Swiss-Prot record:
Belongs to the SmpB family. It comes from Mycobacterium leprae (strain TN). InterPro entries: SmpB, SsrA-bd_prot, SsrA-bd_prot_CS. The gene is smpB. This is SsrA-binding protein. It is found in: Cytoplasm. It holds the Pfam family SmpB. NCBIfam families: PRK05422.1 (NF003843), smpB (TIGR00086). Keywords: Cytoplasm, RNA-binding.
Length: 160
């Protein structure tokens, strides 16, 4: 994976189903405590957030079930691909998360994993799970929006 010459975000992995399955309430950026072979594997662009989720245990936030495959050139120092990884947040942010999770039926869902200024960051969302009818409404809204754009394009081209 090539480095970003402008120093912006270099996205490694995204959780595409998260925005479909959850209604996002608030976004957080957190650092991730990783081992050397994990960082090398991420630099090659290998990671999956498909089944990942975050939990708060005894005042610490943990990212669970994220898959970072073993580094190809690593030896006995390689890591466990599905190990729990600690997320680095300020105490106030953790306290806010704990309060909001306790109050409502909310979950912490990772949306993307990226490099920012050489450090691995994860974009976390405080989210509420969508019901089936919510997903259908979103799909209908997207279809209607697509149809409006298509119609405007036809009119602009003079097809009607």
């Amino acid at each position: 994976m090539a480095r970003n010459p402008r120093g912006g975000k270099q996205i490694v992995a995204t959780n595409r189903k998260a925005r479909h399955d959850y209604a996002i309430i608030e976004l957080f950026e957190a650092g991730v405590a990783l081992l050397g072979t994990e960082v090398k594997s991420l630099r090659e662009g290998h990671a999956s957030l498909a089944d990942a989720f975050a939990t708060v245990d005894s005042g610490e936030v943990w990212l669970r079930n994220m898959h970072i495959p073993e580094y190809q050139h690593g030896s006995w120092t390689n890591h466990d691909p599905r190990r729990n990884r600690k997320l680095l947040l300020h105490r106030r942010q953790i306290d806010t998360l704990v309060g909001k999770i306790r109050d409502g039926n909310l979950a912490l869902v990772p949306l993307s994993l990226y490099f920012a200024e050489g450090k691995v960051k994860v974009e976390l969302a405080l989210a509420r799970g969508k019901k089936l009818h919510d997903k259908r409404q979103d799909m209908a809204r997207r279809d209607a929006q697509r149809e409006v754009i298509r119609e405007l394009g036809r009119r602009a081209k003079g097809m009607l």
